[in-house]
Amino acid sequence: MIEKIWSGESPLWRLLLPLSWLYGLVSGAIRLCYKLKLKRAWRAPVPVVVVGNLTAGGNGKTPVVVWLVEQLQQRGIRVGVVSRGYGGKAESYPLLLSADTTTAQAGDEPVLIYQRTGAPVAVSPVRSDAVKAILAQHPDVQIIVTDDGLQHYRLARDVEIVVVDGVRRFGNGWWLPAGPMRERAGRLKSVDAVIVNGGVPRSGEIPMHLLPGQAVNLRTGMRCDVAQLEHVVAMAGIGHPPRFFATLKMCGVQPEKCVPLADHQSLNHADVSALVSAGQTLVMTEKDAVKCRAFAEENWWYLPVDAQLSGDEPAKLLAQLTSLASGN
């Protein structure tokens, strides 16, 4: 229902317009206060790169963060990552992730990023505290990438990158809750890079698509082509589950059942195992896998995806960030 409201297919969005105007007024006032320096943002001693959205979730932001961190690491840059840690609840903040940190403590995305990149990752509702925690333990970090946080103006930033769903774009264009917008589309004019996931990019935008890898068994780590798996039940607890189901079909998999879950939904063995019957195979997103690995069954697999950026602009962006991190 919410997708139909936000896309404009349902007329119910008009009933929510008063709340949207209020949201836009408050969020705009907050940004203006920081722009006029009526409120002071904290500036880190190292460059900060924000990777965020203009819309609510499901745009492919986390794969972009992983891509960015890995690309900078390959260039010899020491990177730290900070996040709000949505869906997690730590005993105290800031929380610096370790091999023992769970998604219940830190949230799905931070654990996934930590496991994929090995970079120092810290979470806190106050992102400046997370930055300070990383720099206290890893003083050699040269640049901070913040996963989400475009609207978190309390943290000053040197580079802003926005990830856009190229198929859904901005829906009906309205602020939450009548539409999907955290900020209006005009905000794109003031950011440093716009990365478009799928669809047809517009002038000045960087094209991106998600490239699926081999399926990985949660229990054994064994890998195989996902098309080799039989009697598949697909599960996705991400911002836009249909994208994952479409990816499976693109890989030659016709799921017997597709199970969309809420983003950041907590999972347990009983609920997940109930999704599959004898002889069926469960295939989930990598984001779900970080929550299920501790209690996984032998017939549970996940499909990792990597961001693939096209054109000349990614190299220019990476050169800019490498120069920033190196102090040039």
Swiss-Prot record:
The keyword ATP-binding applies. GO terms for biological process: lipid A biosynthetic process; lipopolysaccharide core region biosynthetic process. Disulfide bonds: none annotated. It catalyses: a lipid A disaccharide + ATP = a lipid IVA + ADP + H(+). It comes from the Bacteria. The keyword Nucleotide-binding applies. GO terms for molecular function: ATP binding; tetraacyldisaccharide 4'-kinase activity. ATP binds at residues 55-62. Pfam families: LpxK. Transmembrane segments: none annotated. Its EC number is 2.7.1.130. Keywords: ATP-binding, Kinase, Lipid A biosynthesis, Lipid biosynthesis, Lipid metabolism, Nucleotide-binding, Transferase. It is an enzyme of class 2 (transferase). Transfers the gamma-phosphate of ATP to the 4'-position of a tetraacyldisaccharide 1-phosphate intermediate (termed DS-1-P) to form tetraacyldisaccharide 1,4'-bis-phosphate (lipid IVA). PANTHER family: TETRAACYLDISACCHARIDE 4'-KINASE, TETRAACYLDISACCHARIDE 4'-KINASE, MITOCHONDRIAL-RELATED. Belongs to the LpxK family. This is Tetraacyldisaccharide 4'-kinase.
